[in-house]
């Protein structure tokens, strides 16, 4: 569960390394984001020469959470870290590569480009 002020690792090569959540999109009083949800965040750490800079406000989709997600068959998928991928307004990733595994739930949320770029889909 990602909420306001949560810090996430960035799982792409857009130039950002860490994000701070500003808002969870979807509904007026929504508090938590899970895998596949879109957040508004600011870049807290960035690598030199990247597409995004420190202080930029970006949209991102959550691809890994420590709290995990429940599947329809009753199983759970859980990761070691909270991570997100920075996206454009048309839901395509800003970077050209995705690092680390992503959850299968992204396929249900129509993030097919992220799923196809990911090295592993769990």
UniProtKB/Swiss-Prot annotation:
Annotated Gene3D superfamilies: Ribosomal protein L14
GO CC terms, sorted: cytosolic large ribosomal subunit
Molecular function terms, GO-annotated: large ribosomal subunit rRNA binding; structural constituent of ribosome
Classification via SUPFAM superfamilies: Ribosomal protein L14
RNA-binding among keywords: yes
InterPro entries: Ribosomal_uL14 (IPR000218), Ribosomal_uL14_bac-type (IPR005745), Ribosomal_uL14_CS (IPR019972), Ribosomal_uL14_sf (IPR036853)
Entry keywords, A to Z: Ribonucleoprotein, Ribosomal protein, RNA-binding, rRNA-binding
Any GO BP: translation
SMART domains: Ribosomal_L14
Matching Pfam families: Ribosomal_L14
Disulfide bonds: none
UniProt keyword Ubl conjugation, yes or no: no
Family to which the UniProt record says this protein belongs: Belongs to the universal ribosomal protein uL14 family.
Subunit annotation: Part of the 50S ribosomal subunit. Forms a cluster with proteins L3 and L19. In the 70S ribosome, L14 and L19 interact and together make contacts with the 16S rRNA in bridges B5 and B8.
Function according to Swiss-Prot or TrEMBL: Binds to 23S rRNA. Forms part of two intersubunit bridges in the 70S ribosome.
Name the UniProt record assigns to this protein: Large ribosomal subunit protein uL14
